């Protein structure tokens, strides 16, 4: 951890969460050994040793220039600390992409009219016992100090972090749940389904920002809560989010960048990519305007991570925030597709990435 940046190891984080079950994350999900590119471009580079696309004069924004300089610094430090691998596997991340396809090949029950009831289990539970007419409308909690297991009708196992609570359904259901249980959250992390012409998630939310405008975020927050929103690199989106925070009576305290890197420490995209794909995403952090709590957060922090090969998955942030002295007792993740310990997670696919297709037995233990 540097004052300007950090290098996260998401794989090790999940391994630590499920150590009690003798599980580890499937390492191939993180075998991002080369930059992201179409197979045709990769084959051309492999044959000729050069890219097959014509480069225009390099045009990068001030933001990209800063990130490019930071990427060099991160690679140098990571190499010196022997964090990064020296050799890459020349398969255009094929093994990792196949692992992602397998990881997503699971069935998540449909949501029905939301209930505020919490069903608790500890060691193991059958998915059928959590469902009604083939759908889930309750909130499910793994109440033990160790991870639990949910098994569906075909024998597929889902591994649930300790003291985590999840709900399959619309994120707006959290408002009714919050009122029913007199529960406010002191940390909210959200990864909304921002509209994209090139990528559309499996049927989940409307692919626009209307779902955000329907959320009444302030009513589920404690007075001194911190909120963290992932945003895309679409032009104007940061300004839109600032306006939305203002509507919620909140102000931005910092904007961080996630730099996505290969196992060798290189950015997964070129900074002058003609298709406007860049190797970083932004995380906006905000608090209530009338809160007197001071968050000692660097304004322009960068954290680098080898991404899981599942599209749009973001690294867990709890330990990173704790490093900066952020104390929280009731964290909430909106639009969740994976679960975290002692955290409420809400979305149409909250335990998508908890299946046995993501984890395997840790034979080293």
From Swiss-Prot:
Described function: Methylates DNA on the 6th position of adenine (N(6)-methyladenosine). N(6)-methyladenosine (m6A) DNA is involved in epigenetic transgenerational inheritance.
PANTHER family per UniProt: N(6)-ADENINE-SPECIFIC METHYLTRANSFERASE METTL4 (PTHR12829:SF4), N6-ADENOSINE-METHYLTRANSFERASE (PTHR12829)
Pfam families: MT-A70
InterPro entries to which the protein is assigned, alphabetical: DNA_methylase_N6_adenine_CS, MT-A70-like, SAM-dependent_MTases_sf
Enzyme class: transferase
Lineage: Eukaryota, Metazoa, Ecdysozoa, Nematoda, Chromadorea
Any one Gene Ontology BP term: epigenetic regulation of gene expression
Stated name of the protein: DNA N6-methyl methyltransferase
Entry keywords, A to Z: Methyltransferase, S-adenosyl-L-methionine, Transferase
Family: Belongs to the MT-A70-like family.
Catalytic activity: a 2'-deoxyadenosine in DNA + S-adenosyl-L-methionine = an N(6)-methyl-2'-deoxyadenosine in DNA + S-adenosyl-L-homocysteine + H(+)
GO terms for MF: methyltransferase activity; nucleic acid binding; site-specific DNA-methyltransferase (adenine-specific) activity
Organism from which the protein derives: Caenorhabditis elegans
Domain of life: Eukaryota
Enzyme Commission number: 2.1.1.72
